[in-house]
Swiss-Prot record:
Stretches with biased composition (Acidic residues): 429-449
GO BP, sorted A to Z: microtubule-based process; response to cold
Region Disordered, residue ranges: 425-449
Family: Belongs to the tubulin family.
Keyword Cell division: no
Subcellular location(s) of the protein: Cytoplasm, Cytoskeleton
Name the record gives this protein: Tubulin beta-6 chain
Binding site for Mg(2+): E69
Positions contributing to GTP binding: Q11, E69, S138, G142, T143, G144, N204, N226
InterPro entries according to UniProt: Beta-tubulin_BS (IPR013838), Beta_tubulin (IPR002453), Tub_FtsZ_C (IPR008280), Tubulin (IPR000217), Tubulin/FtsZ-like_C (IPR037103), Tubulin/FtsZ_2-layer-sand-dom (IPR018316), Tubulin/FtsZ_GTPase_sf (IPR036525), Tubulin_C (IPR023123)
SMART domains from the UniProt entry: Tubulin, Tubulin_C
Species the sequence originates in: Arabidopsis thaliana (Mouse-ear cress)
Any further remark recorded for this protein: There are nine genes coding for beta-tubulin.
One cellular-component annotation, GO: microtubule
Length: 449
């Protein structure tokens, strides 16, 4: 019941995704061959959200792995949990997308997409009551961004009433892998605004900072970054996988977090984050978790919530704790920092509690915030985009794959619209509702055109 299909695409998506499966397998007591070796009935109670039980009693992840080159998948296959995936669910091409969104979305990716959709259908038919899809990808490359958004739009057509959740790694301000990241990211956001229900925004630089400052790692590797992401991913979905006092699912999450359909890009955080050496000196209490969870240094994307206001937020606590204390702490945060929450959405913080803590911790919490300050990220990418697009730099790589400049202009203006929508609601107060009604009528007229 309530299954989620997991799809990972491109190098980044496959690396994050395989780390996620290591964490989830560990939490459910499933070993790398798919056998159950756990010690608690709770691990198996809702194991079918993410796993299919095969005839011989093995548990197989409901995961689909795709890429336009075989390299990353080979390393997933030879990795610690590589043998647990269904071999048919590895779908890969040979050519690679070469960090080119157009190759992923229109040419190379379009040739492979039907093979991926066949696997998606097969997995969806195996579900009792499919709740939705979660997609792991990056927006800076070619496959995860171009082919990832193509797949999302195709799934949208075929399963319009299912939730679509993405874990999207945005290009970072200082750490850049490729020159054309701003192009790829802007074209992807253009798609995600329309076709995804919820986007968890991640960004390597913020993750580096967490590893460096909070976890005191001198040379953080991608493995360390992905470990942070997988802790968050596991936290977002723990309510679905374990019993809890206040449960939520993907749809409840969306209903509580998204006041306006386009504004579905969330900041995520995780607590407790402690360096390996200092764990034993830390007392874990609900107030301490709450404090760290709302800390701007804890956010996994490079935007500072203090520069904007929270429209809504959701906190998921895990472990044995009193729900009364959780509620008190959350109200406390809102009262002390009321200027950081929009006053025209009362009670805009939802909390849920799941009884099972992650491995090695007595309690933990995952934070998801819909903050207007996320416009900083879009603004930054947009500036880099404009700087290059004004000179038409690197455009021939995209037009050569059949793209039109018009599409770039549309994506650019869609992203700028998104930024100004966030700004509009950041400045809004509870009194000036008259202005809005007019704006909304105008928007409707535009929509119908």
């Amino acid at each position: 019941m309530r299954e989620i299909l997991h799809i990972q695409g491109g190098q980044c998506g496959n690396q994050i995704g395989s780390k996620f499966w290591e964490v989830v397998c560990d939490e459910h007591g499933i070993d790398p061959t798919g056998r159950y070796v756990g010690n608690s009935d709770l691990q198996l109670e809702r194991v079918n959200v993410y796993y299919n039980e095969a005839s011989c009693g093995r548990y197989v992840p409901r995961a689909i792995l795709m890429d336009l080159e075989p390299g990353t998948m080979d390393s997933v296959r030879t990795g610690p949990y590589g043998q647990i995936f269904r071999p048919d669910n590895f779908v890969f091409g040979q050519s690679g997308a070469g960090n080119n969104w157009a190759k992923g979305h229109y040419t190379e990716g379009a040739e492979l997409i039907d093979a991926v959709l066949d696997v998606v259908r097969k997995e969806a038919e195996n579900c009792d009551c499919l709740q939705g899809f979660q997609v792991c990808h990056s927006l800076g490359g070619g496959t995860g961004s171009g082919m990832g958004t193509l797949l999302i739009s195709k799934i949208r057509e075929e399963y319009p009433d299912r939730m679509m959740l993405t874990f999207s790694v945005f290009p970072s301000p200082k750490v850049s892998d490729t020159v054309v990241e701003p192009y790829n990211a802007t074209l992807s956001v253009h798609q995600l605004v329309e076709n995804a229900d919820e986007c968890m925004v991640l960004d390597n630089e913020a993750l580096y900072d967490i590893c460096f400052r909070t976890l005191k790692l001198t040379t953080p590797s991608f493995g360390d970054l992905n470990h942070l992401i997988s802790a968050t991913m596991s936290g977002v979905t723990c309510c679905l996988r374990f019993p809890g006092q206040l449960n939520s699912d993907l749809r409840k999450l969306a209903v509580n977090l998204i006041p306006f359909p386009r504004l579905h890009f969330f900041m995520v955080g995780f607590a407790p984050l402690t360096s390996r050496g200092s764990q034993q000196y830390r007392a874990l209490t609900v107030p301490e978790l709450t404090q760290q969870m709302w800390d701007s240094k804890n956010m996994m994307c490079a935007a500072d919530p203090r520069h904007g206001r929270y429209l809504t937020a959701s906190a998921m606590f895990r472990g044995k704790m009193s729900t009364k204390e959780v509620d008190e702490q959350m109200i406390n945060v809102q009262n002390k920092n009321s200027s950081y929450f929009v006053e025209w959405i009362p009670n805009n913080v939802k909390s849920s509690v799941c009884d099972i803590a992650p491995r090695g911790l007595s309690m933990a919490s995952t934070f998801i915030g819909n903050s207007t300050s996320i416009q900083e990220m879009f603004r930054r990418v947009s500036e880099q985009f404009t700087a290059m697009f004004r000179r038409k730099a690197f455009l021939h790589w995209y037009t050569g794959e059949g793209m039109d400049e018009m599409e770039f202009t549309e994506a650019e203006s869609n992203m700028n619209d998104l930024v100004s929508e966030y700004q509009q609601y950041q400045d809004a107060t509870a009194d000036d509702e008259g202005e809005y009604e007019e704006d909304e009528d105008e928007e409707e007229i535009l929509d119908h055109e």
